[in-house]
Amino acid sequence: VFAVNTVGTVLGAVLTGLVFLPVLGLASTLALGIGINALIGWVTLASRRGGVTRALVQGLVATAVLVAVVSLTLGERWSRAFVLGLWRDVRPPASIAEFRQRADIYNLAYHRDGAGSTVAILAVTNRAGQPSISLKVNGKADASSGEDMSTQILAGQLPMLLHPSAERVLVVGAGSGVTVGSILQHPTVKAVDLVEISPEVTEVAREHFAPFNHDALRNPRCHTHIEDAKTFLQTTPESFDIIVTEPSNPWMAGVAAVFSQEYYQDCLARLKPGGLCAQWIQAYETDDETFATVVATFGSVFPHVSLWQTSTSDLLLIGAAQPYRPDLQAMARRLAEPAVAADLGRIEITRPVNVLALQMVAFGDAFFLAPDGTTIHSDFHPVLEYRAQQAFFVRGMAMVPYRLNEVQRPRPRTLLGEHLARAPLTAEDCRALARQFAKIGIPQLPIFRSVLRRWQELQPKDPTVLRLLSTYAIQNPAPDGEVASLVSHPSFSNEEQLGDLNLMRQLADLLLLQHRTRRSAFHLPDSVRLEVFLGALTQLDPARQRTHRMRLAEVSWDRGNDARARVLFEEALDLDEKRFGPLDFSEDPGCPAGMMARLIDADLRAGDLKGALDKVLRFRRLGYIRPERMTGDEVLQMLARRVIVTAQSSLQK
């Protein structure tokens, strides 16, 4: 009996996974299982009466009929229901009618139940009348010819633009094949190895997404491997200039294994010296702690990491094992290659500034996004298996990368800052950025508005920028719109009425809020009036003069007057209470930390590690730096972590 049970169990598992599911599909396989169980019962009962052969024939016929009926009547309906992915929907259908309505919206262009996953293609026409197809794996959308195009293209193009001359590239996860197609647009590429565990996904990429991926999977330079990514990395003799790893979200069953430290170590072992590894991560259906775990794990192997934004809620980590500094001029030349330019033109990226504006955190900084003590996800301690699913359940979003986006700052540490220092923003740059942001979407609307304001300064009579400003003002009212009307109110605009100290404080608060809201790497608003009032308040409001001096230091720094900013900062922290009043910043508690981050940043840029470390230790004694937590000013915490780790590494050497 034991032997028969064992043989039956093994045969059932093998036949179901490798034969019945791929051939019959999930619904018919379930019907077959029901029929076989009923057949066994029917034959068992018949054996007592001696009619085993007749019962067996009857049972087989009944099972075949059941499978045929289910396949013909329920097959497509079953498939439609399962690929909808309602388990992700925060608002499930309220009725059967609504459920059927949702299921009928899409045209099921392809459906296949494979041994490892159910793969489907849904075709739909959007509101603009444009057709689009979406790849769904186990009910979860993993690629499309619509809103996902920017991420799919940039996952291939960004590392290719950053690398000086990539010849061999590995892509983990086929998806739509668009990433592979984008990589193949570079003439230096001799071979792309594509590793995908599901043959159904590669079939979809080859047959359905060919118009969108440049028919990449039929390109002779593309070599497709149906294999587990870890197995491939551990067995291939090849080395690669770039590895792009883009599995699904880590909360999907089994996917967290390709976010582990061991997996990244396997990637590093197959990278050539100077190679880059790019990891697609999602900011949606997650949280800051899960995001920190992914960054810390990736950074434990590739410590020189930068963070890039590829769409509204999709991000890309690009890391190297050694310090990495891209050549911006060479990047511009690669961007100008006709095939590359045409590929990026599909997502309105036409100029170097379009590419550089996507970098959120600079090389060498992104590793320090994760607080000290963040748990590393490994095969032996798979914390992401639980944490990612927990974060998915509460439908959160990782906000740290957006709060730390360097594009929001007038003097970014990113490649964009380096580029703008050499080539100031032009009207054509602004036009290109506006098209790009409108195409891919961007969560930080103030950045978009700052581009439009700079464009308006450069071309005040251009009807396009005026139309865009008015459109976005109507659709997305600016948070500083009310502030702008208040600061121009007669009570504030008439300087003679400002003998009232409370009115002066309120005006300074409003002007500073407007300044902070409007500043970015692209545009710095005029701050003369703000500086005049803050300067006056340092004399007229001695009880709060430390706050006024600290704010004035911040604005001076934004304007590039570093010497004045340093003097004001030191005065604001001076222990002489008789001269500067009580050491109290309760009116603007975040202002000192912001200035501390700027001063540490200045030392790092100047290569003065000792000066940066002295400031970190000083500010830590003051209670502003707590690198083990995701609290306080996040830029300050990130820079402090970088200084401490760099100093420790220098001592060890």
What are the language-model segments listed below?
Residues 444-456, 479-495, 520-538, 564-574, ...:
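Alpha-helical repeat scaffolds
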Residues 1-46:
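Membrane-embedded alpha-helical segments of integral membrane proteins
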